Structures are given as C-alpha cells and as structure tokens.
C-alpha cells in the first residue's frame, strides 16, 4: 500500500498548466477533510504515514529524516543539561562577549571596535556585528558620504545568526575543551558558506526534536545560568553570513560583499592574496585608471573582535590606497618617530628580502607607514618585538619547565614576522603588477620568484646566536662521529675514516667526517705514486658545528635527541667557523669533565686538545701545498639551494682551470646523503669538462614498480617533456647516480631509488608518516634539481657557465614553468595532491627547516 501510494502517477505539465484553479480548490478541500477526520484510512509503514482520503486526487507521503539521523548529544559539565551537538562535537557559543569591545563602539555604531584607519583613507574596521548592528554600520558610512562600500568578511570559521527578539545575533560552534577559541579548518575542502548551511539544517533539526528549542551559551566566562534556550521554529530563524552581508546590495547598488577568509595568525596563503587582487581587478574604482574626480570607495573589514585579521585587512587596504593616491599620506609626527625608534632593529631575513627586491627599502618603508596608520588596536611589528623579548627573557635554567612557554613565544614571534614579511612581498608585487592591471596573479608572481620562499624558510636563524657555553653548562652534549657514522663500507681499518669510496674511473672521492689523522692518510693516498694527484680540492658539506677533541670528531647535540643534527640555518661558512672557534675556546677554558656520547656508551671526558676543522686543514696545507679546502653547507635530505650549486661549480671551475687532473674530495657527517649528492654534481660537471662516457642501454628491471625505481614519476616526466632534449638530460643524471652508487651498495643509498623506497614506508610507519612524506618529497625534489642542473650545464656551456645556476633558474627556468612544477610536487600516481600541503614550495621548504629542538639562541 505504502509503495503504491508513493508511486501514484503525477499530472503532466500540460494538465497542471491548464488546471491550476481546480487543483488549488481541491487541495484546500482535501486539507480540510483531513483535519476534520473524514479520511477513509491512515496506513502507516516504516517510512512515514500514508494518508488516503475520500475522492482523493493526490496521495502523498511525509518523508522526515530527523528521527532517523544519528545525531550526537553531550554536555559541558555533569550539572548541565544534555543536548545535541553541532557536527557531533561542538557547542554553539555567542560570538562576541561584551569585554571584547575595547573601543566601546557597539552602542554608538552597532559594531564592536569600529574605527577608521589613519591617513585620511576611507578604510574602516570592526568586530562581528548582529544583523541590526550591520545595518547601523552601513547607515553610518552613508552618513559620512560613502555611497560605494566594499565589505570584506575576513572570517574562515562558520558563523550563524539566531533570531532573538528584534535582531539576529551571531553564534559560532566551539569545542568543549576551549569555548573561547574559534574553529579552524573544520572540514578539508568545505567552504565556510557550505558549513554554515549544514549547521543551519542541524540546528533546525535539533529544535524540532526538542519542542522548537535549542541550547546556546552566552556567558562562557562563568557559565552562570548556562546553557540558555533559544526558540527556533523554522530555518528562517537562522541566517547565515551570506544572507546577512549580501542582501544590502538590493538597497545599496554600489555596495559589494566579499568573503576573504584570513588566518588568525601568520601570513595568508597565496590563494587568499589572489582573491584580494581579484577584487581590485573587478572594481573599476580600485583601478589605477579610475575616474579621479570620484571619491574612493570605502573599504570595510571585519573579523570576530576586529583586531588581528581586521588589522591585516586594513594594512592591505592602506597599501592599495597608497598606490591609488600615489602618496604615503601625511608625515609622522616627531612624537611618533620617537616611539618607533626602539623598533628600528631589523631582522636578518627582512634585510635579505629588501636587499633583493627592487626598491626594497622604499617598499618596506611604505609597509611600515601602513602598519603605523592602522595600529590603533594592534601593531604587527610591536607583536614581533614583544614576543622576541619575552622569549629571550626566559632563562636557560628554566628550560625544562619553561619549554612550552618558550615555544609559545617563539611561535608568536615567527608568525608575526611571517605576516610582516608577506606584507613587504605583497607591496613589492603591487609596485610591479598594479601598473600592469595585475597581468600576473600573486601566486604566479611569487612562484616565479621562488628565492622568496628560500628566505622565508630561514626566518629562524637563532642558532647563529646560541651561547658557546651550552655544552659546558650541560644544556647540550658532545656526540662522537663514531656514534653518528657507522662504518658500513669497512674502510676505517685502511683509510682511518668511515665509508671512504671513489667514483669508478674518476678522481672523485667521498667519505664521512675525518679526523686530522684520517685526513692526512687520505691525502697521502691521493698523492701516492699510483694516483699521482698533484692537487686536491676538499669540500666539507657539513652545516652543523664540528670539533676535533682528544683526536675524535664531536658535534654538539641536544641530550634528548642526540641523533638529530643542529643545523645552522642559512649560515655562511664564516659564520659556522666563528661559532666553532667560540665553542673550542669555551671547552678549553672550562677544564671540566664533560659527558660525551661514544659509539657504545656515554663517558665523562676532560677536553685536553681541541681543533676546529678549518685549523686541521690549515695545518695539512703546510705539508700538502696544493690542497684547497672549502666549506659549502648542504642540507641533509634535500637538494642544495641554487646558490649551493653555484658555489660548488665555481670552486670546481677554478680548480680545473689550474689543474685538470685535480682530485675532488667530499665529506659530510657519515659520507652518505650529502656526500653522494655532491659526488653526483661533481660527476656531471667533470663529464661536461672532459666528455661523457658511452652509456649502456637500460637494463630490464624485473622488480615491482620498476619505472618508479628508475625515477619515472609523473612530475619527473612532465619536467622531461618541458626541458630541451629532456630524455637525454634525465638519462645522463641516472648514469651519474648509478656510477656514484656502484661502490656503495652496502650503504643501501641510491639517490633515485630511495624516493620510492621512502614513499612505500609511509603506510607501514604511521607514527612517522608525516616525516616520511616530507622526506620522500625532498628526495624527489633533489632528483629534479639534478636534472635541472644537468640541463643548465648543457645550455650554458657555450658561455662557459658565466651565468650562475641560480640566475639561470630565475631568468630561464622560472618563466618556463619549472617552479610551477615544483609548487605542485607530489606523487600524483598514488594520491590527490590537494590532500597534502607539502606539495607546495612554501610549506615544504618551511617544514624542511623546522627541527623542533629547544630554542637556545636569539631571533636576529
């Protein structure tokens, strides 16, 4: 019966069009009949009641899924009522509490912390309003003469407006653990608007299950009288953000609304900058070619409280207004200048940035001016320095108890510094692209200037200021290389150094870090009657501190993570050598027993003799006059920076110009990853100088996923198709990799094969999945860089490589789309790249330099 009733034939469109009046009258009669209990029968089934009437023309079922939906319930504490939870987890909390309105503007303007920025620009900021409050804000702007208003809602978290008395008040879902904190990244890929629609339906369903009532929380400070009931009779009692902010367009034709979700800390993502630029392109009144006789539009920015994100929006708006009016507005007063003097200390990363940007100093000063004009409630630069001072004010003695506090202030300082960094970058983009009507999006422009990402990844250079007495005070320990570099190739007995090897038929050698004795043995070996190398270039690839103490090589490490090296990020060789000299002086001066970690055990040792690596090789030069020693720091698991390639090529060119038969020796801590990378680079370079050998045809590899073992990943093959003679470029790199790895099979380290090996481990090692995913991508990136470097050697050979690799990447490879490939780097054969942020240059390079070790130095 139920099935028959629900499947009753429907009137055709033609019949319905010609019988509207009859149908309406019949419906009213049928409805009246039902309510007068004149129905013939009411038949129920598991789906819903089926109502059949006398002389019926229509049969219908009521489908209501509310009772069947698996909604969850919960409570904040045992003495509070239990009720349904939004999205199965969250409580609905009144969005803005009264104390948040620091400027006390809700009563007068309708919005908390409503204000206009300085400089006379039509820029306004505020916190979250109610529906009625927003109408009052718009009326206030119209009263001030602003007919054209562009409003930006900067919130990424969902907000819904619930009907209460004569207004609709904003509420947001919050977690039980922190009722004060907004949700972030609630669902991957879901827009804020979609989430709000889902929440509205849930709230309506909850109310239907509870006599049209739902529980909300207004006082989360004391929870007195909470939760409170609010009446929801229909979905019309709930507004979403879009409904509140888009509808004024019908009464204000010159009004525009945009939702531009910004992060609560740190810099926005490139896509968010792109969305802002799209607004500039869409609105003629924000074009450089606008009608100058017309007033500038008012830009209104709003977040929750009207402080952090609103401040960022106001600064972006100020930069736009500066470009539109071609002025930096009025000069700062002497009093203001005096206040800002204390913050003229510049960070290294900012100095490097403005040093490379066109008109960098001017670009930065404009950003500083914009920050000053918008600093009534929040100052980004002030935030950096406040966090820096608090971070460095926490004493080393309280490291164990205070590590979380240090992490908190370090995170705050770096997030504010990143935001400041991106504002300078964005202003540089405006300088270049505003006159071009934004022919290039911000994300495209930034991708073509990938050196900016390199700088960003090295914001934290605190190790350059780490105290020299950390070891003598017990905060760090000395770890012997014998513990860090097992001699897998069994070469210590003969050569006195671990993992010594040679590229077959070439004068290229690699090894772990040698002692002074081992270095002397290696040099004697290279210059004997059999090999007869008259000159030797020795390159140390280490980017951490090293010392030879009591005839052993030691590195300072954190006592809880002795296997993790402490990189001196973005350091010049001179910086590392200076730190090593300070550490040596401290060790010799202390004359105390120190804990050291050896291969099998920990011991207490007194440091009686100590030398830096530079001193070791200076001494060796007295007996080997043709020895050249260079330190070129390479990262452990990834490709060298573009400048790293430059440095290695330059020193090889200079050496070969003097002696074409020179030996090239490379070492890192264990003779593995960095040494192998440098040996491959040297092999390719020498082949270009001396000619390529004949390569045998590819062997048929009978192993699972053989093409991935051979490096034929989709992103690699895209690069191969992009490069001139790309197949040959890859084939030559593969030959170099195979040649270098031929004598190191026991190390189980092949720069190409390790890519897929590492990726396969991700599923089996859940605890280290994120680290393995990063390593696999960095290995893949390193392989791609080797192919790019080989292409550079081919294409620039005619000019003897006068143009450095770093410049070639910027001038040639970047416009060709190489960095766009690297900005979508991933294993698209196995996964959706949208599911991983590590595919992006910004995230990957930042994560590469995050070591998670205790903060020991100072932000510089």
From Swiss-Prot:
This is Paladin. Residues 13-24 have a biased composition (Basic and acidic residues). Its main location: cytoplasm. Belongs to the paladin family. It comes from the Eukaryota. It comes from Danio rerio (Zebrafish). GO terms for cellular component: cytoplasm; cytosol; nucleus. Gene3D superfamilies: Protein tyrosine phosphatase superfamily. One of its GO terms (molecular function) is protein tyrosine phosphatase activity.
């Amino acid at each position: 019966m139920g099935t028959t009733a629900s499947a009753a034939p429907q009137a055709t469109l033609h019949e319905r069009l010609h019988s509207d009046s009859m149908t309406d009258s019949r419906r009213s009669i049928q409805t009246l009949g039902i309510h007068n209990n004149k129905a013939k029968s009411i038949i129920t089934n598991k789906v819903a009641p089926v109502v059949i009437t006398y002389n019926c023309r229509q049969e219908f079922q009521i489908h209501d899924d509310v009772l069947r939906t698996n909604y969850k319930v919960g409570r904040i504490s045992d003495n509070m009522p239990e009720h349904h939870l939004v999205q199965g987890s969250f409580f609905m909390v009144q969005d803005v509490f009264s104390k948040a309105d620091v400027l006390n503007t809700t009563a007068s303007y309708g919005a908390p912390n409503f204000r206009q920025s300085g400089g006379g620009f039509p820029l306004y900021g505020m916190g979250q309003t109610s529906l009625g409050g927003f109408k009052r804000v718009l009326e206030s702007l119209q009263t001030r003469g602003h007919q054209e208003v562009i409003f930006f809602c900067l919130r990424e978290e969902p907000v819904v407006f619930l009907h209460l008395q004569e207004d609709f008040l904003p509420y947001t879902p919050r977690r039980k653990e922190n009722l004060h904190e907004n949700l972030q990244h609630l669902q991957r890929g879901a827009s804020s608007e979609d989430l709000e629609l889902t929440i509205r339906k849930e709230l309506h369903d909850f109310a239907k299950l509870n006599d049209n009532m739902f529980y909300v929380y207004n006082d989360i400070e004391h929870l007195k009288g909470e939760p409170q009931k609010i009446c929801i009779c229909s979905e019309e009692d709930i507004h979403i953000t879009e409904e509140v902010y888009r509808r004024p367009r019908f009464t204000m034709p010159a009004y525009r609304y945009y939702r531009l979700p910004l992060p609560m800390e740190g810099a926005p993502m490139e896509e968010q900058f792109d969305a802002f630029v799209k607004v500039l392109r869409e609105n003629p009144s924000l074009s450089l070619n606008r009608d100058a006789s017309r007033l500038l539009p008012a830009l209104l920015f709003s977040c929750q409280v009207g402080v952090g994100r609103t401040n960022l929006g106001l600064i972006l708006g100020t930069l736009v207004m500066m470009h539109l009016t071609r002025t930096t507005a009025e000069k700062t007063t002497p009093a203001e200048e005096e206040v800002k003097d204390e913050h003229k200390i510049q960070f290294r990363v900012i100095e490097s940035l403005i040093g490379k940007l066109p008109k960098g100093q001017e670009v930065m000063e404009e950003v500083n001016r914009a920050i000053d004009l918008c600093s009534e409630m929040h100052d980004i630069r002030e935030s950096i320095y406040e966090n820096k001072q608090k971070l460095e004010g926490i004493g080393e003695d309280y490291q164990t108890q205070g590590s979380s506090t240090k992490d908190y202030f370090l995170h705050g300082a770096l997030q504010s510094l990143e935001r400041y960094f991106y504002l300078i970058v964005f202003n540089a983009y405006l300088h270049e692209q505003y006159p071009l009507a934004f022919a290039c999006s911000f994300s495209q422009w930034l991708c073509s200037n990938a050196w900016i990402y390199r700088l960003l990844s090295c914001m934290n250079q605190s190790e350059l200021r780490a105290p020299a007495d950390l070891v003598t005070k017990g905060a760090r320990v000395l770890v012997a290389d014998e513990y860090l570099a097992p001699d897998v190739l069994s070469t210590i007995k003969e050569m006195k150094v671990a993992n010594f090897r040679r590229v077959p038929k070439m004068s290229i050698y690699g090894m772990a870090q040698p002692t002074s004795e081992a270095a002397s043995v290696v040099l004697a070996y290279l210059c004997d009657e059999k090999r007869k190398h008259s000159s030797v270039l020795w390159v140390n690839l280490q980017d951490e501190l090293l010392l030879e103490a009591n005839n052993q090589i030691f590195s300072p490490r954190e006592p809880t993570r002795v296997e993790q090296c402490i990189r001196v990020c973005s350091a010049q060789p001179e910086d590392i050598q200076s730190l090593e000299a300070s550490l040596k002086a401290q060790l010799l001066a202390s004359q105390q027993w120190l804990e050291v970690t050896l291969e099998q055990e920990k011991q207490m040792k007194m440091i009686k003799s100590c030398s830096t690596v530079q001193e070791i090789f200076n001494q060796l030069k007295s007996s080997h006059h043709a020895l050249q020693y260079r330190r070129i720091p390479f990262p452990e698991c990834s490709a060298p920076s573009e400048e790293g390639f430059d440095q290695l090529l330059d020193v090889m060119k200079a050496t070969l110009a003097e002696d074409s038969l020179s030996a090239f020796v490379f070492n890192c801590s264990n003779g593995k990853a960095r040494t192998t990378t440098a040996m491959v680079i040297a092999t390719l370079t020498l082949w270009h100088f001396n000619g390529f050998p004949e390569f045998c045809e590819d062997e048929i590899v009978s192993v699972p996923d053989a093409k991935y073992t051979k490096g034929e990943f989709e992103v690699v093959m895209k690069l191969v198709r992009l490069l001139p003679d790309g197949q040959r470029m890859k084939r030559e790199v593969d030959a170099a990799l195979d040649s270098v790895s031929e004598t190191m099979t026991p190390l189980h380290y092949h720069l190409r094969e390790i890519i897929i090996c590492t990726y396969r481990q991700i599923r089996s090692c859940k605890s280290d999945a994120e680290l393995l995913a990063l390593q696999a991508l960095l290995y893949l990136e390193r392989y791609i860089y080797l192919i790019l470097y080989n292409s550079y050697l081919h294409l620039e050979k005619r000019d003897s490589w006068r143009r450095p690799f770093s410049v070639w990447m910027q001038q040639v490879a970047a416009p060709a789309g190489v960095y766009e490939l690297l900005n979508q780097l991933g294993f698209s054969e196995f996964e959706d790249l949208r599911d991983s942020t590590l595919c992006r240059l910004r995230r990957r390079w930042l994560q590469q330099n995050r070591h998670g070790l205790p903060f020991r130095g100072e932000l510089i």
